[in-house]
Structure formats: structure tokens, C-alpha cells
């Protein structure tokens, strides 16, 4: 059964790292403002370890499909919003648009296994960074397929595996936002978030 979490079941979601604020607007979308200097990244290339981004999540033990529809209003480099899946702090993935003011922005995914993150990207026109985007993650037996919907068509952007996903831990599934820069955070309008066991 597909569950729509915005606006009907927001109160059933758990928050990881409370954002600057969140509220429902007149269109029944959830507005979330990130805090500055927030991110999800472990070790690789940059050397730092940061796990303080904001996630609104539910949990499952089964295969699933999750989707989010959102509109960002970014203002600083690497402002980002999308979908997030976590098995543990050393095993997780995120997919999002990451804003680059002088463009192009990055559309892609970060996958973290054994405490090391990797990052795959494709260019995305920065002038479209505040347009509506949809992200989808499908889990099948520990394997994850990541999609993005640009305009009217779904596009597969990654297939990956989470090494700790062996069926013995709850899987956190949610939408997320963060602002790695030292500037102010930014607002994202989350219009829809659905999960479905498959």
C-alpha cells in the first residue's frame, strides 16, 4: 500500500537533526529551512566527517519504493535536498540536486559503505535549480536503483548496494535537506513524499 506522508502523516515521521524550522504552507506542502554548516559526508577526498543534515523519515524492513517531489530555493554552494536512506551511520545513501551558483549544478547520489562516501554526479542547469524535481529510490534485496524525473520523464542515475543491508536492521527512508556552507540555510518546499512496500 502506498502511503502519502505529506500532509496527512507528517506527525508519523521521525526527525533526524531538527532543522531551523518547518511548517505547512497554504498548499499543504512542508516548508523546511536548513541550518548552515549541515551535511552528510564521511571521509573520502575531503577528509571530514559530517552527519548533521536534516531528515524526516519512516522505517521499514521490506523492499520498497520511495518518492519525493520538491522545489528548492537555494542560495549558497552545495545547498541540497532530496531522498535519504540509512542502515547505520556508516552505511547510507542520498540523492539530490546540489546547487552551484556559478553552475552547472550537480544532480547525483552519494553512497556510503564502511564509513566512506562516494559521489556520482551529472550536470544540471543552475537556472532550473528552483524548478520542481522528483526523486525515486527502489530497494530490492539490498540493491538500490535511483531515479530522477526531469520535466516529464524518469531517468535512472545509479544502481548501488548498501553493504550492511542484510535484512536484520530497520531501514530509514526519508527526505532530507542540508546546507554545507557557513552562510544561512535555505528553504525547500516538499510537496509530496510517498513510500510503498513492494
Language-model segments: which ranges?
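Extracellular glycan-recognition regions
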Residues: 1-198
Amino acid at each position: 500500500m502506498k502511503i502519502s506522508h505529506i500532509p496527512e502523516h507528517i506527525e508519523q515521521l521521525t526527525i533526524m537533526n531538527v532543522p531551523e524550522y518547518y511548517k505547512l504552507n497554504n498548499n499543504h506542502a512542508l516548508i523546511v529551512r536548513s541550518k548552515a554548516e549541515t551535511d552528510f559526508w564521511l571521509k573520502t577526498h575531503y577528509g571530514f566527517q559530517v552527519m548533521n543534515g536534516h531528515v524526516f523519515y519512516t522505517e521499514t524492513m521490506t523492499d520498497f519504493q520511495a518518492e519525493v517531489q520538491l522545489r528548492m530555493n537555494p542560495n549558497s554552494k552545495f545547498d541540497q535536498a532530496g531522498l535519504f536512506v540509512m542502515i547505520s551511520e556508516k552505511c547510507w545513501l542520498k540523492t539530490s540536486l546540489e546547487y552551484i551558483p556559478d553552475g552547472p549544478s550537480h544532480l547525483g547520489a552519494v553512497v556510503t559503505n564502511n564509513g566512506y562516501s562516494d559521489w556520482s554526479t551529472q550536470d544540471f542547469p543552475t537556472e532550473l535549480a528552483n524548478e520542481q524535481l522528483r526523486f525515486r529510490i527502489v530497494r530490492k534485496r539490498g540493491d538500490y536503483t535511483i531515479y530522477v524525473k526531469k520535466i516529464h520523464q524518469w531517468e535512472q542515475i545509479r544502481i548501488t548496494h548498501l553493504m550492511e543491508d542484510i535484512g536484520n536492521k530497520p531501514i530509514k527512508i526519508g527526505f532530507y535537506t542540508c546546507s554545507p556552507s557557513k552562510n544561512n540555510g535555505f528553504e525547500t518546499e516538499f510537496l509530496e513524499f510517498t513510500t510503498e512496500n513492494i
